[in-house]
Amino acid sequence: MGENTVIHPPIFTILADKVKIGKNVTILNGFQCMSAGGLVIEDNTMISLNCTIATNNHDMYDRYVITCKPVHIKRNVWIGVNVTILPGVTIGENAVVGAGAVVTKDVPDNAVVVGNPARVMRYLDSEKFVKE
């Protein structure tokens, strides 16, 4: 876990050793993570209340078979309240995931996504972000 990272309990994670968290990350309470497939959260990311990230799932026909795919959240991402992120997803740099979204596929850099399933509503101007 990187410096200046703040995690507000309670949170729940399975296989926490497969989670890598960068610097200046904030994770609010109610966070749940099934991380068998691996999870990377890069620097300057904010994860709001009651978010769920799943990196593993059960096979549709043989429920004892578990499939794992990593989730990667890139730098400077803002994830709103009650968001669910499913296995295999990469969320691009500077992206915003709106409250209640269910993210089933990759989110491009600078995109604002909302809904179930999440879809791109607009793109942010990358030149307007505060530089480190």
Predicted stretch roles:
Residues N76, N94, A111:
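Catalytic-loop signature of eukaryotic-like protein kinases
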Residues T5, C51, A111:
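Short, conserved active-site loop motifs that form the nucleotide-linked donor/cofactor pocket
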Residues V81-K105:
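Beta-rich strand-turn-strand
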Residues G2, T90, P108:
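Short conserved AdoMet
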Residues P108-D109, V114-P117:
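Acidic, glycine-centered active-site loop in nucleotide-sugar glycosyltransferases
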Residues M1-P9:
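N-terminal segments that cap or nucleate solenoid repeat domains
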Residues H8-T90, N116, R122-E132:
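Flexible, glycine/small-residue-enriched loop-and-beta-strand segment within the central core
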